[in-house]
Regions:
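Conserved acidic donor-binding segment of nucleotide-sugar-dependent glycosyltransferases
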Residues: 113, 316-327, 335-341
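A short, histidine- and acid-enriched strand-loop-helix "catalytic/donor-clamping" loop
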Residues: 15-18, 104-108, 120-138, 148-151
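Donor nucleotide-sugar binding/catalytic pocket of nucleotide-sugar-dependent glycosyltransferases
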Residues: 41, 131, 139-187, 195, ...
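Acidic donor-binding loop of glycosyltransferase active sites
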Residues: 269-285, 300
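Short hydrophobic beta-strand element within catalytic cores of glycosyltransferases
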Residues: 284, 292-297, 301-304
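N-terminal subdomain of nucleotide-sugar transferases
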Residues: 1-68, 120, 396-397
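Conserved donor-binding/catalytic core segment of Leloir-type glycosyltransferases
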Residues: 10, 192-221, 229
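Nucleotide-activated donor-binding/catalytic signature segment of Leloir-type glycosyltransferases, i.e.
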Residues: 241-262, 273
Length: 397
């Protein structure tokens, strides 16, 4: 690559099957003359019981390659078992200067990319934040991939600690999930606060680990009038409905299914605070909490549990309560229910948090910085190699 040529990057991400979920963060990169970005995503993806067709390309500045995948129905581990049978052809056509993977290092597609990338440096984006030994062959794949990775983009300090513990010694920087500010923005008309119950909301899967039981218990303990609106689907919904009935909260808790991004934004705009009370378990730990930044982008503060990445993502834009502690949550609800000014200030702080860390422009810059750094470091190593070899004694002497 000459100094005048743009850096050719091949980014591989199954999430990019969806424009809203995975592609918008790449859009700011199309304006950069120093980058030539090629994005690989599946033509079709199966996740959480749903099959999604790849959205059509919508940004002429990014070259989209929608490729068929194998093993996409190997749930619940399809994220780690899928491969692209035509990836070798794309590698030969693009001849990338840098390969970027938005996949975990033990995935088969990470192994595939390592075997096909040639001398191109590898940038790897990781979410996994629980240190554990993986079953064969995944532990061996992780070790193989990390040894050949030039730069890690970690979602959280816990995720960085995991790759360090597994032997990675290279450069690490941090990257969040971006938020679509055009969709997730403050309501045009602020919600009236006088004589209105405190309106809490939750968006996500309905499973026991999300801690919604703690929210219901806290509502029953609190002296203030509190309502909870739940948007999402999952196997734990019947148990939540039963618990709400047992606590006498049926008329204060509402359920609705998944919505489009625009519907999620309108749902959040009607809240006084969003809750994310995820519980840590031996197998799960909140890796980021994208709904946190969606709420903050709407100017809505967040109440989160002190677990996983939740506190670091919330920042000053909300409150953090102890995990699995309905009493502490009830006390917080009684404190903020009558204090609309405190909620407004935390909401404003959340907007600043998003502007500084989680806009798509910020995420795109984090990506570009990592790609350019990896390429520069690789070039330095190649330039230094002849001098290192001359300085080392010959094994035949």
């Amino acid at each position: 690559m000459s100094s005048a040529s743009p850096l050719r990057v091949l980014s591989i991400a199954h999430t990019a099957v969806s424009r809203a979920a995975g592609r918008l963060r790449y859009h700011p990169l199309a304006k950069r003359a120093d980058l030539d970005v090629h994005l690989v995503a599946p033509t079709r993806w199966h996740q959480f019981g749903r099959t999604s067709e790849a959205d059509p390309p919508d940004d002429p500045g990014i070259t989209m390659h929608a490729l068929p995948v194998w093993f996409q129905h190997a749930r619940p581990v399809s994220w780690y078992l899928h491969v692209y049978p035509t990836l070798r052809r794309i590698m030969r056509e693009v001849k990338p200067d840098v390969v970027h993977l938005w996949e975990e290092p033990w995935s088969l597609v990470a192994l595939q990319a390592c075997l096909l990338k040639g001398d191109a440096p590898l940038v790897l984006e990781v979410d996994q934040n629980i240190l554990k030994r993986l079953p064969p062959p995944f532990e061996a794949i992780r070790k193989f991939v990390l040894r050949r990775t030039d730069h890690i983009l970690a979602r959280s300090p816990d995720a960085a600690a995991v790759v360090r513990a597994k032997g990675y010694r290279g450069r690490i920087s941090y990257i969040g999930y971006g938020v679509d500010e055009a969709t997730f923005r403050p309501a045009a008309q602020p919600q009236p606060t006088a004589k209105r119950p405190l309106q809490l909301g939750y968006v996500g899967r309905l499973v026991a680990d999300k801690g919604l039981d703690d929210a219901l218990d806290a509502m029953a303990r609190a002296h203030s009038a509190v309502r909870l609106a739940i948007m999402g689907e999952g196997p734990y919904e019947p148990a939540l409905r039963e618990r709400a009935t047992q606590l006498g909260l049926v008329d204060r808790v509402s359920f609705q299914g998944w919505g489009t991004p625009a519907e999620v934004a309108r749902f959040i705009q009607n809240l006084d605070a969003l809750i994310l009370l995820t519980r840590a378990t031996p197998t799960t730990l909140e890796q980021f909490g994208r709904v946190i930044v969606e709420a903050q982008s709407c100017g809505v503060p967040v109440i989160g549990a002190a677990t996983g990445a939740i506190p670091s993502v919330i920042g000053a834009g909300g409150w953090v309560v102890p995990e699995r502690d309905p009493r502490a949550l009830a006390q917080l609800l009684d404190t903020i229910a009558p204090d609309s000014e405190a909620r407004r200030l935390r909401g404003a702080a959340g907007r600043k948090n998003v502007a500084a860390r989680f806009t798509y422009e910020a995420i795109a810059k984090d990506l570009a910085d990592a790609w350019l750094e990896a390429r520069a470091s690789a070039a330095d190593r190649h330039q230094d190699a002849p001098y290192r070899s001359l300085s080392q004694p010959s094994p035949h002497r």
